[in-house]
Amino acid sequence: MTKDVINDMKSHMEKSVESLRREYQKVRTGRANTGLLDEIRVDFYGNPSPLNQVATLAVPEPRTITIQPWETKMIPVIEKAILNANLGFTPSNDGKLIRISLPPLTEERRKEIVKSLKKTAEDAKIAIRNIRRDAIDGLKKLEKDKKISEDDLKRAEKEVQDVTNVYVAKVDEVLAHKEKEVMEV
């Protein structure tokens, strides 16, 4: 019974760490990354579609993203969508391909980004601690309902804390990696 609670908790904590990783993919670093364009939707035959479903995205150089639409008539639509997304860069096109050149980040902007990364990481840690609290509440309910003994409860609480520490360390690791990536010139 305690294993079910702990496995459920691990699965929720893993989702929190994955969510943090996905959130960090959207953050602009000194390098180009197609993940920056993940949220952009373009009107494709009346349906708002993700950019990667109407074009091929590539990173040919560290500071350049290229977008090659499958239909050339989509170029102005894609350009407009990128400009409307207000991501801080301007697309240029040569009739077949859209190029986005990312300007280098200033030191001040890098520090702002790191501050934002730390806040997002702290939010992930709070989510993990809330999951821990829910797991401990679930274990206490099992003990109250006499489904597990007090000793089992204490052992399970220790295991819950150990697992929580592992996932908090994972969050710190993801943050450190992204912080290094952002501060790299």
Curated annotation (Swiss-Prot):
Per UniProt, which keywords does this protein have? Cytoplasm, Protein biosynthesis
Do you know which InterPro entries this protein is assigned to? Ribosome_recyc_fac, Ribosome_recyc_fac_dom, RRF_sf
Localization annotation = Cytoplasm
Q: What is its main location?
A: cytoplasm
A GO biological process of this protein is:
translation
Extract the coiled-coil ranges from the record. Answer: none
Keyword DNA repair found: no
Q: Per UniProt, what is one GO molecular function of this protein?
A: ribosomal large subunit binding
GO cellular component, as recorded: cytoplasm; cytosol
Question: What exactly does this protein do?
Answer: Responsible for the release of ribosomes from messenger RNA at the termination of protein biosynthesis. May increase the efficiency of translation by recycling ribosomes from one round of translation to another.
Q: What is this protein called?
A: Ribosome-recycling factor
